[in-house]
Amino acid sequence: MKKTLLTICLMIIAIAAKAQVPNFGTTAGDQKLYGYSAMKYKAKAKTWETYSTLQYGVTDYMNVGADLYYDGSDSYIGYTFRTGKKFSPYFSAGAQFTPSFNLGENHKFAYMTEALYMNGNITRDGRMFWVTNTWLEQANHELSSAKQWTYLGYTCPLGNKGNSITPMAGIIHDWKFESDVDLSFGAYYSHKNINVYAWTNDILTDHPRFVLAVEFKFSNK
């Protein structure tokens, strides 16, 4: 187990952006360790962001964990509480709450992130599916950001070993009505308990973002 944890930490350090790749409604599961780490590049602005999170399943329906985020100038740590459940093959729902603190200002509270995740199958075999994520960010006692990310995806099996690639495309809607609808698309490759993402969003803006990320889940049982 110690060797596995060390491997995970090294992966995070090596790969470690606050990026909205699709999040699904379910949690990691009881006694399972979940990790996600990404790098995001904002074109033309030539800035890099990094984001990493580790979460542990305390029950089948609840994760607790922490994340680290660097926006190009400041570093933040967040403490995550996530819950979720699969109600049927066609509907899963979950929520996440993360207060974040500025590490450069003596752990001063910076902002609160709240999210609602929903997803479900469209076809009976589960290959075609939908995902929707609602992200709210509150700073200085006011709602600073409210975005809706909605995706369609299709899983394409690769061979007979359980590997697959899943292209997805979606739109980004601003619930504050301060920006135009935008596009997001990408794909992830799945091998056993590991997903590797190549993603992009803000396509129609002056500064599109490009993301590379890895996601993994291991059981402690």
Each PLM stretch: what is its role?
Residues 159-195:
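Glycine/small-residue-rich hydrophobic helix-like segments
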Residues 10-18:
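Hydrophobic h-region of N-terminal signal peptides that target proteins for export
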Residues 17-41, 221:
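Outer-membrane beta-barrel biogenesis signature
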Residues 1-4:
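Positively charged n-region of N-terminal signal peptides that target proteins for export
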Residues 82, 185, 206-221:
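Outer-membrane beta-barrel "beta-signal"
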Residues 33-50, 55-56, 60-151, 167-171, ...:
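Outer-membrane pore/translocation modules
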Residues 30-34, 59-61, 86-90, 123-127, ...:
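Strand-connecting loop/turn motifs
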Residues 6-8:
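Sec-dependent N-terminal signal peptides
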